[in-house]
């Protein structure tokens, strides 16, 4: 599906939200000579959270989307000490204070599943987008179709307006575009608390090595336990250890509109007081003040569609996932790769006058919906299951290491081994059929 030649852009698109998915998509569209404007509600680009990882399928999608996006990631990615991902028993107490029983492991492939600091990756992506294509401080209120049927009218909370041929919502887990597509009274328009939350923090690597040993500190590890688990992996070029410590919370999240709340190291230490020495030592290394993040997702009420006419949603706005697969952001990159490819095809269609812009865009977004809905929602569902498995709550596996390993291996490779080239081939075929 080749891009159009460098003539006057045929399409003028609006992206709502300037996070990783929105910026990556914008870069891919601009590289295909499609004009795009990003509308971001914040006064500056910022990413919440600390570390983030991308699986091999996500890296292949970055390359397909725009090799510059992949280069931006690699510029800030931290290689693991080994190409292994290890799952260990973080719960049992052992006489050797650095020892945790290896339950199972998998080979990630050369430089597979690397992590980076979210803000550093975002900074690299921002460099790919000209300032003239960005509007900050813009909170979307509604989208309507103009009387002539050609343009969509965007209205913002500050009273300003804009026009676009199509609107792509990359506005995160509490997406306004999702509400506009599905309806404000639809439960699927809103994420739900998954009854897990996480203490998140960064630890200086030299202190982590003292507590865990060099290889463990510099290699991605999942520390399993009863009703809680901990993920550790290196970021910031190996200078920091990213720690994400999950706990099950049967109650409701008390902080209403906020997805995070201040927490103390003492709370994390107490939550993991029954775990083995390595996990307790890592908790002791956390900063005195932390954030505790509520894990919300779209599992309970998945969207029936990601599209309405010439509006669509992508990334967390479409299928916010719990982080237990480490695949949420990567799934958004897959979305972006499909959108960039099919919108480039729609631009060619409009340029040839075979269809109107509106007809071409409706067909393109219908294709996107058909290609992405099932897979992305499977990731949401499977991620929930892994969150239970890591805390010995998943009945089919319990604490059986062999069963846990087989389940994790199968589910992980469904994501990691995804054929991105085939996804794009099916995208092109589906779009062509819709034009016939």
Curated annotation (Swiss-Prot):
Residues holding FAD: 40, 53, 118, 316, 329
Result of knocking out the encoding gene: Impairs the production of azaphilone pigments (MonAzPs) but accumulates the benzaldehyde 6-(4-hydroxy-2-oxopentyl)-3-methyl-2,4-dioxocyclohexane carbaldehyde, also known as M7PKS-1.
Cofactor(s) this protein requires: FAD
Keyword Calcium: no
Taxonomic source organism: Monascus ruber
InterPro entries: FAD-bd (IPR002938), FAD/NAD-bd_sf (IPR036188), FAD_monoxygenase (IPR051104)
EC number: 1.-.-.-
GO molecular function: FAD binding; phenylalanine 2-monooxygenase activity; pigment binding
Family membership noted in the UniProt record: Belongs to the paxM FAD-dependent monooxygenase family.
Biotechnology: As colorants, MonAzPs are widely used in various food products for centuries. Moreover, MonAzPs also possess wide-ranging biological activities such as antibacterial activity, preventing hypertension, lowering cholesterol levels, causing hypolipidemic effects, and displaying antiobesity and antitumor activities.
Stated induction or repression of this protein's expression: Expression is positively regulated by the azaphilone pigments (MonAzPs) gene cluster-specific transcription regulator pigB.
Record-given protein name: FAD-dependent monooxygenase pigN
Keyword ATP-binding: no
Described purpose of this protein according to its UniProt entry: FAD-dependent monooxygenase; part of the gene cluster that mediates the biosynthesis of azaphilone pigments (MonAzPs), a complex mixture of compounds with a common azaphilone skeleton very widely used as food colorants. The first step of the pathway is performed by the nrPKS pigA that forms the hexaketide precursor from successive condensations of five malonyl-CoA units, with a simple acetyl-CoA starter unit.
């Amino acid at each position: 599906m080749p891009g159009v030649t460098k003539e006057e852009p045929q399409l003028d698109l609006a992206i709502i939200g300037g996070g990783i998915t929105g910026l990556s998509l914008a870069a891919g569209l601009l590289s295909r000579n499609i004009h795009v404007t990003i509308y971001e509600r914040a006064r500056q680009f910022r990413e919440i959270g600390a570390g983030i990882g991308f699986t091999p399928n996500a890296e292949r999608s970055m390359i397909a989307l725009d090799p510059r996006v992949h280069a931006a990631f690699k510029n800030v990615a931290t290689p693991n000490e080994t190409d292994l991902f290890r799952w260990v028993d973080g719960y049992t107490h052992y006489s050797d204070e650095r020892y945790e029983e290896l339950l199972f492991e998998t080979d990630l492939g050369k430089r597979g599943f690397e992590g980076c600091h979210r803000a550093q990756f975002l900074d690299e992506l921002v460099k790919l987008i000209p300032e003239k294509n960005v509007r900050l401080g813009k909170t979307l209120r509604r989208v309507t179709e103009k009387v002539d049927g050609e343009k969509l009218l965007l209205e913002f909370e500050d009273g300003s307006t804009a026009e676009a041929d199509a609107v792509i919502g990359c506005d995160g887990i509490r997406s306004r575009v999702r509400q506009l597509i599905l309806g404000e009274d639809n439960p699927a328009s809103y994420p739900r608390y998954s009854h897990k939350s996480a203490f998140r923090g960064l630890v200086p690597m030299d202190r982590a090595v003292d507590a865990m040993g060099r290889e463990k500190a510099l290699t991605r590890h999942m520390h399993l336990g009863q009703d809680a688990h901990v993920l550790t992996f290196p970021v910031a070029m190996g200078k920091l250890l990213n720690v994400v410590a999950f706990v099950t919370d049967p109650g409701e999240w008390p902080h209403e509109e906020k997805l995070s709340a201040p927490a103390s190291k003492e709370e994390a230490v107490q939550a993991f007081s029954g775990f083995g020495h390595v996990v307790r030592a890592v908790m002791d290394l956390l900063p005195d003040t932390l954030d505790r993040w509520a894990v919300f997702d779209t599992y309970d009420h998945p969207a029936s569609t990601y599209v309405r006419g010439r509006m669509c949603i992508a990334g967390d706005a479409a299928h916010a996932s719990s982080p237990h697969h480490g695949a949420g952001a990567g799934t958004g990159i897959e979305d972006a790769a499909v959108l960039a490819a099919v919108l480039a095809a729609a631009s060619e269609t409009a340029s040839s006058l075979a269809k109107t812009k509106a007809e071409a865009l409706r067909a393109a977004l219908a294709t996107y919906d058909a290609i992405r809905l099932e897979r992305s929602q499977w990731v949401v569902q499977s991620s929930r299951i892994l969150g239970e498995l890591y805390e010995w709550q998943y009945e089919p596996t319990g604490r059986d290491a062999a069963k846990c390993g087989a389940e994790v291996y199968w589910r992980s490779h469904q994501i990691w081994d995804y054929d991105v080239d085939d996804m794009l081939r099916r995208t092109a075929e589906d779009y062509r059929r819709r034009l016939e």
